């Protein structure tokens, strides 16, 4: 049936071309449907008739009713829809019969005419000019009721956008998030910068990178897993307040919260610490919610998230003890006991974990999903935070926070480690833990996803001022502000396996 409909559409296209119709390329719509609807929704039929308001619109036809010598079409654009009224006697001889009647759902039309309201009060355009701008050769899905197959929605996002206005609003909100972040950052005197997407050494996070090859230089390069080390080089160079919004890439698993290509915002502020950055993060998110949602509350799933109150703060160990009454503080200082706890929780551990990694596993398994209201978790173990400054109070933890909302991580920040010697030791320790290698000269034998960035150490040796940093996942933030459960629903074209 679909093949027959496509065949009919091609026959109509051939007929239109054969009879000398040229598809215009110079039609310029002056009005959009949403603005027209908002502006004239309260006008009466008599008011519109007397005003004789002329408009010019374009969009995709999504419905039609042909009634002899007149027709009603529904046109849709990104933000709304409007009805067209076409009468045969207003157009050239045979134009209505030969062409207008052969137009199909999905065709893109341009129209000019006067606004009026039908007897039922529907705002419409009485057309004095109408043109077929593009002929759709394939029919719209399910007679324009939308796509039901989830995979098809992701693979053919253009069809999903055509048939799903809610989806359009999600991506409009995503765009507003970018706009309002930049608005806030510029107001706070931050400079937006760009750092390399392809790097000689993929640093700033522990993740497996995508590898590419530069033919002229004959070297392997890596799509960045994080911009962090380059941004901190800029702080060394004298830029005190910077941010970047851009893509990062990690050659790892795909889930409802992870896409290999994702959008991050990173912020760095000299002469500040992680407490300052927590305060900054809190104010930024409060601003975004107010600007985008219109109030201080956000619905996500069954949860109502309140952004009006000051965000709750507690340490990693305090959070574990709060949600695990059977665990004692002394247990979290004993690797043997923590290994037993991890095993009891059913956590699949493929390699030996150190104390910091064990604590993090327990937290991820038992606490993270319970953090519904905005919560800063503080003081992470030094073993899982190689770029963070050690705490002045407890050298086993670092001045780091992660922000959790509605059960998942939204942001990560810390006081930056600016001790070059300590950073060098941490880099080497990270390599040793991953590969059981003690000799720096064997760096060529390391897996290519963990390498030692000697130039970054050199930069630190020139002096990094006391600095705090922040990373926010824009995709997850969009999920939160649009009430979506999957990261794929807030990315236009998520990564998928090729279809068979």
UniProtKB/Swiss-Prot annotation:
Complex and partners: Homodimer.
Please provide the Gene Ontology terms (biological process) for this protein: lysyl-tRNA aminoacylation
Q: Tell me, what is one Gene Ontology molecular-function annotation carried by this entry?
A: lysine-tRNA ligase activity
Family assignment? Answer: Belongs to the class-II aminoacyl-tRNA synthetase family.
Keyword field: Aminoacyl-tRNA synthetase, ATP-binding, Cytoplasm, Ligase, Magnesium, Metal-binding, Nucleotide-binding, Protein biosynthesis
Which cofactors?
Mg(2+)
NCBIfam families per record: lysS_bact, PRK00484.1
* Originating organism: Buchnera aphidicola subsp. Baizongia pistaciae (strain Bp)
> Under which EC number(s) is this enzyme classified?
6.1.1.6
In terms of domain of life, where is this protein from? Bacteria
| Cofactor binding, note field | Binds 3 Mg(2+) ions per subunit.
Q: Which reaction does it catalyse?
A: tRNA(Lys) + L-lysine + ATP = L-lysyl-tRNA(Lys) + AMP + diphosphate
Its EC top class is ligase
* Key word Transcription present: no
The identity of this protein, by name, is Lysine--tRNA ligase
Which residues hold Mg(2+) 1? Answer: 402, 409
**Which residues does the record give as Mg(2+) 2 binding sites?**
409
Gene from which the chain derives: lysS
- The answer to whether the entry has keyword Ligase is yes
């Amino acid at each position: 049936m679909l093949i027959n409909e496509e065949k009919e559409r091609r026959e109509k296209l051939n007929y239109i071309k054969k009879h000398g119709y040229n598809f215009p390329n110079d039609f310029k719509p002056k009005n959009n449907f949403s603005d027209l609807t908002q502006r004239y929704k309260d006008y009466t039929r008599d008011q519109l008739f007397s005003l004789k308001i002329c408009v010019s619109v374009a969009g995709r036809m999504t419905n039609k009713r042909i009634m002899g010598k007149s027709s009603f079409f529904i046109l849709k654009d990104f933000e709304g829809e409007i009805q067209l009224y076409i009468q045969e006697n207003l157009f050239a001889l045979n134009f209505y019969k030969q062409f207008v009647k052969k137009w199909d759902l999905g065709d893109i039309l341009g129209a000019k005419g006067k606004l009026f309201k039908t007897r039922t009060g529907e705002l419409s355009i009485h057309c004095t000019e109408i043109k077929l701008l593009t002929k759709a050769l394939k029919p719209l899905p399910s007679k324009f009721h939308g796509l039901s197959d989830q995979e098809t929605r992701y693979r053919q996002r253009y069809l999903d956008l055509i048939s799903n206005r809610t989806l359009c609003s999600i991506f409009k909100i995503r765009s507003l998030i970018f706009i309002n972040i930049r608005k806030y950052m510029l107001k706070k005197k931050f400079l937006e910068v760009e750092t390399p997407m392809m790097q000689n050494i993929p640093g700033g996070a522990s993740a497996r990178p995508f590898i590419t090859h530069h033919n002229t230089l004959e070297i392997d390069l890596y799509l960045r897993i994080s911009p962090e080390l380059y941004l901190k080089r800029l702080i060394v160079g004298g830029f005190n307040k910077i941010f970047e919004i851009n893509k990062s890439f990690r050659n790892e698993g795909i889930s409802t919260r992870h896409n290999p290509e994702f959008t991050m915002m990173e912020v760095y502020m000299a002469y500040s610490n992680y407490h300052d950055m927590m305060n900054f993060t809190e104010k930024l998110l409060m601003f975004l919610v107010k600007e985008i949602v219109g109030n201080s509350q956000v619905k996500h799933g069954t949860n109502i998230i309140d952004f009006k109150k000051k965000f709750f703060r507690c340490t990693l160990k305090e959070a574990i003890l709060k949600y695990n009454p059977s665990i004692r503080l002394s247990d979290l200082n004993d690797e043997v006991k923590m290994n037993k706890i991890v095993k009891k929780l059913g956590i699949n551990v493929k390699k030996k974990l150190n104390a910091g990694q064990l604590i993090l596993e327990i937290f991820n398994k038992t606490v993270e999903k319970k953090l519904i209201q905005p919560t800063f978790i503080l003081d992470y173990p030094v073993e899982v935070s190689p770029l963070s400054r050690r705490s002045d109070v407890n050298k086993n933890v670092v001045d780091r926070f992660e922000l959790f909302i509605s059960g998942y991580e939204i942001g990560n920040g810390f006081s930056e480690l600016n001790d070059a010697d300590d950073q060098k030791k941490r880099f080497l320790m990270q390599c040793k833990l991953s590969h059981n290698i003690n000799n720096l000269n064997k760096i060529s034998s390391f897996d290519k996803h963990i390498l030692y960035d000697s130039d970054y150490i050199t930069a630190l040796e020139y002096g990094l001022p006391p600095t705090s940093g922040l990373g926010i996942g824009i995709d997850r933030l969009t999920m939160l502000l649009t009430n979506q459960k999957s990261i794929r629903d807030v990315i236009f074209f998520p990564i998928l396996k090729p279809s068979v």
